[in-house]
């Protein structure tokens, strides 16, 4: 799905650790939305909501404040959420610390967190499998990508 609008960005400053995040999205018209976290990691993709409907999306985030990205280091300041949607909606988020296992992944450019320009176009934006990986886990595990 392509998104023309800038994403709604929610930032919650927290120390390093693992957190359960619940994002509640309420549609004011028929919408399709995608939730990304941290460095564009997919947490929920192409969720449909009808006008007046709400959806709670719960996922886990591992916060590590120092990541190497090519030759640069990226400072992550807590839980970072982007909600991509071209329709009219409101969103709330709740962040709570949790004590759960974390899967650490590393690898080459096929794993790494790739940046994207907006408007978002899935056909012309690269994405490592490490960015898609977290959406396939339930709320009992977190994924930390150090590729």
Report the location of each language-model feature.
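Short, surface-exposed beta-strand/strand-loop-strand elements in extracellular ectodomains
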Residues: 10-11, 25-46
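A short tyrosine-centered beta-strand micro-motif
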Residues: 17-23
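Short beta-strands within extracellular/lumenal beta-sheet-rich domains
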Residues: 2-17
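Solvent-exposed, conformationally flexible loop/turn segments
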Residues: 16, 47-56, 64
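Beta-strand elements of well-folded, non-transmembrane domains
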Residues: 14-16, 27-29, 63
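Serine-esterase "nucleophile elbow" of acetyl-processing enzymes
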Residues: 81, 85-146
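Hydrophobic residues positioned within well-ordered beta-strands of beta-sheet architectures
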Residues: 10, 21, 57-59
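Noncatalytic modules at the cell exterior or secretory-pathway interfaces
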Residues: 63-85
């Amino acid at each position: 799905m392509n998104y023309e609008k800038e994403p709604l960005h929610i930032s919650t400053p927290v120390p390093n650790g693992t957190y359960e995040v619940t994002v509640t999205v309420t549609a004011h018209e028929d919408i399709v939305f995608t939730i990304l976290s941290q460095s564009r990691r997919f947490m929920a993709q192409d969720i449909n909501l009808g006008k007046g409907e709400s959806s709670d999306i719960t996922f886990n985030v591992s916060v590590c404040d120092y990541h190497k990205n090519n030759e640069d280091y990226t400072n992550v300041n807590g839980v970072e959420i982007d909600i991509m949607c071209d329709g009219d909606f409101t969103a709330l988020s709740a962040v709570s610390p949790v004590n759960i296992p974390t899967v650490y992944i590393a690898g080459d450019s096929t794993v790494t967190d790739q940046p994207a320009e907006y408007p978002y176009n899935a056909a012309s934006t690269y994405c490592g499998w490490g960015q898609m990986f977290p959406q396939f886990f339930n709320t009992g595990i977190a994924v930390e990508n150090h590729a």
